């Protein structure tokens, strides 16, 4: 969502004073895809952390013109495991997968193959 405004070549040496890092928004690739969707299916991803996670993910799905959105939580960051919910355009959770990240990815891919591709 954000990147540093400027890149520093090499290593920044300590100077004994605080460093301020300015961030700028990155391009919204998912929104661009949604605007040019045509007949393609779009699966979006939403990392949400509060009690409104489902609502926020559904809002993102609609704003970005996705067909489904994968909701996951920050607890997955740095973890070997994950739990995701697949939410459709009607706001319904159509699948929940949990396990190792590899297992969850495999389950998600199987869902995509059987639901979208066929």
Describe these PLM feature segments.
Residues 66, 73-118:
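Small-residue (G/A/S/T)-rich helix-start motifs and N-terminal tracts that mark the onset
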């Amino acid at each position: 969502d954000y990147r540093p405004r400027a890149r520093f070549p090499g290593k920044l040496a300590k100077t004994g004073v605080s460093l301020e890092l300015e961030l700028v928004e990155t391009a919204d690739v998912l929104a661009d895809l949604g605007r040019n969707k045509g007949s393609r299916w779009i699966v979006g991803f939403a990392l949400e952390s509060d009690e409104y996670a489902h609502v926020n993910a559904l809002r993102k799905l609609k704003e970005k013109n996705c067909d489904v959105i994968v909701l996951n939580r920050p607890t997955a960051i740095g973890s070997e495991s994950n739990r995701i919910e697949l939410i459709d355009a009607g706001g319904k959770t159509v699948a929940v997968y949990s396990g190792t990240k590899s297992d969850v990815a495999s389950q998600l891919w199987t869902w995509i193959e059987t639901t979208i591709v066929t």
